[in-house]
């Protein structure tokens, strides 16, 4: 075992003395050492319950003959970080989490790992670490929050942000805003729609790194505790069989994940995270393949913000395996791939029925014949940009309107809230990309303000930043190349007509090649906004959104 270097032989006596200082017995040192990566903290609602999940994992590991040892990972709440400087520190934690987990796992020679994440950057960061370290690993998330209720109807955090927009527009009272505030987030857990955290937890299950229910069993259900115990037991089986992350997360597994991404209507952030995880496995996952997969993958789920169903409803309808079984009626999945269950994808999903065709549409009656995400290209985004097609109203799938250009989120939000944005406009927010932000902030406040003012079906928003999974409407992000490196989004001017055709996968601003060349010749790079600390280092190394905003290591 890997841990033999710290537990066996006379040369390891110093290490054993330190393990003894932890209270470990000789018997415990003779067992496999299983690291449990706990992301518990008291500031993230999706992580406040993870101490209970971790305790259940420890019990499972012990029952199966291992020695569980807990160490921490950080986590940021994107909702709390939203709309201020703190959002610059969200995406960047993905790489901090991967780096620090790699360091802990390698320094202490663990034999296996159980990852206990839940929220947005925590899940992909730990998947990246799992791919790097490549020792037997399993994931068990903290689970989704239950939906809230306002006026007797289910609702969630996306409605809360939109309520702020409605309040600023004078459409609701302060009392109604307070009602939303006190009711949309009723429990612990990751926010209740198909937002980024739940998207990644569901895709972890699809990749084969989490057991059935990992993405959908609510945080407050006892079944979640049982799942954690099973994960603790299962890791010992994976260790015995020497099944490792790179055995599970193959290229075909990522194709399955992309297919299910389209079927579920996941967050556009998945188009950042899946390529980043694949990069750690050792291959390039080009986002261009999304359109090829989308063209043959029907969208079967309209979970919030695209619709009025929630992760708890998906769980009741049969969960991720039921959606996989439904989509595979078209033969779209690779079913011979090994997973953390020790079985193949096909064996896992066999017999998993769709219990509610209103939540999981049958393949013969999908929400749309194409998938939930589209990748667009054109002179505004020569490399690519992405949009959650399933959350766009039909009339906005094709739109042409004048640009209203802003160089930061705050200026755009002020313009929206003061009525300077009108029906037909295309809001452009730039210099918010991975380098330019730095940190590629989410534009949930502007999109929510647009929706809250009743403009969601008539105004588009384009950015080199990104979007929360809670954003809806014609919200087009990850524009690459970004403005900070001279991408064409930096050359757009107020009043330029912008043409968007999501069904045709195109996005252009209507200026001549000669005018574009003139503007490019006059463009000058801006000084970095931040020159010290982690963000400065991140900005120096980070790549474009179309590459997953991975860090580019200089070659020596």
From Swiss-Prot:
It comes from the Bacteria. [2Fe-2S] cluster binds at residues 119, 191. It catalyses: (2R)-2,3-dihydroxy-3-methylbutanoate = 3-methyl-2-oxobutanoate + H2O; (2R,3R)-2,3-dihydroxy-3-methylpentanoate = (S)-3-methyl-2-oxopentanoate + H2O. Belongs to the IlvD/Edd family. Gene3D superfamilies: IlvD/EDD C-terminal domain-like. The gene is ilvD. Its EC number is 4.2.1.9. PANTHER family: D-XYLONATE DEHYDRATASE, D-XYLONATE DEHYDRATASE YAGF-RELATED. Keywords: 2Fe-2S, Amino-acid biosynthesis, Branched-chain amino acid biosynthesis, Iron, Iron-sulfur, Lyase, Magnesium, Metal-binding. One of its GO terms (molecular function) is 2 iron, 2 sulfur cluster binding. Binds 1 [2Fe-2S] cluster per subunit. This cluster acts as a Lewis acid cofactor. Homodimer. Its cofactor is [2Fe-2S] cluster; Mg(2+). The modification N6-carboxylysine is found at residue 121. Pathway: Amino-acid biosynthesis; L-isoleucine biosynthesis; L-isoleucine from 2-oxobutanoate: step 3/4; Amino-acid biosynthesis; L-valine biosynthesis; L-valine from pyruvate: step 3/4. GO terms for biological process: isoleucine biosynthetic process; L-valine biosynthetic process. One of its GO terms (cellular component) is cytosol. The active site is at residue 468. Functions in the biosynthesis of branched-chain amino acids. Catalyzes the dehydration of (2R,3R)-2,3-dihydroxy-3-methylpentanoate (2,3-dihydroxy-3-methylvalerate) into 2-oxo-3-methylpentanoate (2-oxo-3-methylvalerate) and of (2R)-2,3-dihydroxy-3-methylbutanoate (2,3-dihydroxyisovalerate) into 2-oxo-3-methylbutanoate (2-oxoisovalerate), the penultimate precursor to L-isoleucine and L-valine, respectively. This is Dihydroxy-acid dehydratase. Mg(2+) binds at residues 78, 120-121, 442. Signal peptide: none annotated.
